[in-house]
Structures are given as structure tokens and as C-alpha cells.
Amino acid sequence: MMLEHVLVLSAYLFSIGIYGLITSRNMVRALMCLELILNAVNINLVTFSDLFDSRQLKGDIFSIFVIAIAAAEAAIGPAIVSSIYRNRKSTRINQSNLLNK
């Protein structure tokens, strides 16, 4: 019974993250939605790691690596957004065409 609740929560977080990532026009909101997706993946990793083999910590250790990557993204992402804002005076995704040239 608990497994279904955790998987529904994870699917709900993942769906909100994907929906927000697709529909957001603001870079900060897109970064927040990406964090939701990574957290949903972490919940699944820990849940299935405990379900299949509770003696080994492979899923837990892998989720720690995903958390470290998310922390790096949370540190570098806003710096990139603030740099784009200083140059373009906007954080809208559709107005950012720095890589098109």
C-alpha cells in the first residue's frame, strides 16, 4: 500500500515538473520545474532500491549523486539567469537567443 502512494507522489511531482517545463516562459520557473523532476527521480530511486534489495544502498548512493548534480545546477543556473538578465534585461526563454548566432 505504501509503495503505491510513493509512486503516485513521484508521478505527480514528475508530471508537474514536465508540465511546468513545457509551459513556462521564465527561466527561473523552468529551473524550479527541473528541480521537481530531479526530486521525483530521487524518490523513485530510493523506493525501488528499497523494494528490490533493501540490504544494498545502490539506489540511495545514486540518489545522493543526483542531489549533488541538482545542487550544482541550483548554484550555476541562477548565475546564468542573472547574467542573461544583465545583458538582455529579460528572463523570458523565448527572448533568449544567445546560442543562435
Swiss-Prot record:
Gene Ontology cellular component annotations, sorted alphabetically: chloroplast thylakoid membrane; NADH dehydrogenase complex
Protein's job: NDH shuttles electrons from NAD(P)H:plastoquinone, via FMN and iron-sulfur (Fe-S) centers, to quinones in the photosynthetic chain and possibly in a chloroplast respiratory chain. The immediate electron acceptor for the enzyme in this species is believed to be plastoquinone. Couples the redox reaction to proton translocation, and thus conserves the redox energy in a proton gradient.
Name of the protein: NAD(P)H-quinone oxidoreductase subunit 4L, chloroplastic
Catalysed reactions listed for this entry: a plastoquinone + NADH + (n+1) H(+)(in) = a plastoquinol + NAD(+) + n H(+)(out); a plastoquinone + NADPH + (n+1) H(+)(in) = a plastoquinol + NADP(+) + n H(+)(out)
Molecular function (Gene Ontology), one example: oxidoreductase activity, acting on NAD(P)H, quinone or similar compound as acceptor
Class of enzymatic activity (EC top level): translocase
Residue ranges of the TM segments: 2-22, 32-52, 61-81
Superkingdom as given in the UniProt entry: Eukaryota
Gene: ndhE
Keyword Magnesium annotated: no
